[in-house]
Amino acid sequence: MSHSVKIYDTCIGCTQCVRACPTDVLEMIPWDGCKAKQIAPAPRTEDCVGCKRCESACPTDFLSVRVYLCHETTRSMGLAY
């Protein structure tokens, strides 16, 4: 069962979500022209189990990473007709 994982622009690159994920869906990649890394824009969603630990670990006021479970994906992401 595939879930959608979305990384928003509010991400501060703290890596809390990356470390919280038990299945390594999220990963850090090099950021052009910077020593810091950023979260890869295309998470490996096929490994997502929908635990939402990444959401719980996010310290920003607006969750920078969101997991949309397969049954709520179209409604939550504003894709429903």
Curated annotation (Swiss-Prot):
HAMAP family: PSI_PsaC. One of its GO terms (biological process) is photosynthetic electron transport in photosystem I. Keywords: 4Fe-4S, Chloroplast, Electron transport, Iron, Iron-sulfur, Membrane, Metal-binding, Oxidoreductase, Photosynthesis, Photosystem I, Plastid, Repeat, Thylakoid, Transport. Gene3D superfamilies: 3.30.70.20. It is a peripheral membrane protein. The eukaryotic PSI reaction center is composed of at least 11 subunits. This is Photosystem I iron-sulfur center. [4Fe-4S] cluster 1 binds at residues 11, 14, 17, 58.
